[in-house]
UniProtKB/Swiss-Prot annotation:
Signal peptide feature range: none
Protein name: Sodium/potassium-transporting ATPase subunit beta
Keywords: Cell membrane, Disulfide bond, Glycoprotein, Ion transport, Membrane, Potassium, Potassium transport, Signal-anchor, Sodium, Sodium transport, Sodium/potassium transport, Transmembrane, Transmembrane helix, Transport
Taxonomic lineage from the root: Eukaryota, Metazoa, Ecdysozoa, Arthropoda, Crustacea
Membrane topology: Single-pass type II membrane protein
Similarity section: Belongs to the X(+)/potassium ATPases subunit beta family.
Subunit structure of this chain's protein: The sodium/potassium-transporting ATPase is composed of a catalytic alpha subunit, an auxiliary non-catalytic beta subunit and an additional regulatory subunit.
Subcellular location: Cell membrane
Cellular compartments per GO CC: sodium:potassium-exchanging ATPase complex
Residue spans crossing the bilayer: 48-68
Molecular function, one GO term: ATPase activator activity
Disulfide links within the chain: 145-157, 168-182, 233-290
Ranges per topology, Extracellular: 69-315
Length: 315
């Protein structure tokens, strides 16, 4: 076999670059004056491009956001009544609510007596009613209303917390210490106007008999008090009806219609009805269902329309 030529023995035998040398060459190439693969002019062009691009993008976003905010009214909801998520029915709610850690619960459970654990519920109700106690009726937006004295336009009716009586007060621990707990029911929906029953003949067949009788007495005694969204609360099942005992409603057996509609008048506070359970049995949980009654309120237990549910247990 012929010997290789002397020059061929040294082809490709030069020293190889190390990884560090290769990296340094990428960062700065002195032969081409490139920094990380680009010349100074190339870096200037791409920097100017992205500055202009992101400036235009931010300006477009700001412009769209400004146009969007022009469509909003921070005092009036865009979707109301039947167009809203909750529909045309007003919402019923109750207080006190269970702790935030039990967000899915509707159970009010406590041990009454001096050594009881009722303090949380009393504190919760005290906090809820604090705005009612601190707000006076001397403001320009407020007026004292009555069944024959509706509010003036642009003003809200003042709800006097003293109407809740002597039993459902923080001084009396809202009845929890004595085993006669109070629960507050509220009814509200923006822009909703109640269509009340003008006579006892208009009430539905499924209205509880005791409320029907009460409305008849009101109609006979003082018909102006018919201007009311009525409220009924009772045990949800036959067994609950037996265990629930007596319920006292204050200040009314419902919500005076002159408090509605709610139109976001500054300082408006929704009216409440205080329920006092006077004869609960120890260790017995009771399912309570409250319903609101008016011509334009639909009631459906499955969808919780026109009603609110909670449980109460005293130990």
């Amino acid at each position: 076999m012929a010997d290789k030529k002397p020059d061929e023995q040294f082809v490709g035998s030069g020293p190889k670059e190390t990884k560090w040398q290769s990296f340094k060459g990428f960062v700065w190439n002195s032969e081409t004056s490139q920094f990380m693969g680009r010349t100074a002019g190339s870096w200037a062009k791409i920097t100017i491009f992205y500055v202009i691009f992101y400036t235009l993008l931010a300006g477009f976003f700001a412009g769209m956001l400004m146009i969007f905010y022009q469509t909003l009214d921070f005092k009036i909801p865009k979707w109301q009544n039947k167009d809203s998520l909750i529909g045309a029915n007003p919402g019923l709610g109750f207080r006190p609510m269970p702790p935030e850690a039990q967000v899915d619960s509707t159970l009010i459970q406590f041990k009454h007596g001096i050594k009881g654990d009722w303090q949380y519920w009393v504190h919760s109700l005290t906090e809820f009613l604090e705005p009612y106690e601190t707000l006076t009726s001397s403001g320009q937006e407020f007026t004292n209303c009555d069944f024959d004295k509706p509010p003036q336009e642009g003003k809200a009716c003042n709800f006097n917390v003293e109407l809740l009586g002597d039993h459902c007060t923080k001084e009396n621990n809202f009845g929890y210490e004595l085993g006669k707990p109070c629960v507050l029911i509220k009814l509200t929906d923006f822009g909703w106007r109640p269509e009340v029953y003008n006579s006892s003949a208009e009430v539905p067949e499924d209205m509880p008999a005791d409320l029907k009788s009460y409305i008849k007495d009101i109609e006979t005694g003082n018909k102006t008090h018919m201007n009311m969204v009525w409220l009924s609360c009772e045990g949800e099942t036959a067994n609950d009806k037996e265990k629930i005992g007596t319920i006292t409603y204050t200040p009314f057996r419902g919500f005076p219609a002159y408090y509605y509609p709610y139109l976001n008048v500054p300082g408006y506070l929704t009216p409440v009805v205080a329920l006092q359970f006077g004869s609960l049995q120890n260790g017995q949980a009771v399912n309570v269902e409250c319903k609101a009654w008016a011509n334009n309120i639909s009631r459906d237990r499955q969808r919780r329309l026109g009603s609110v549910h909670f449980e109460i247990r005293m130990d």
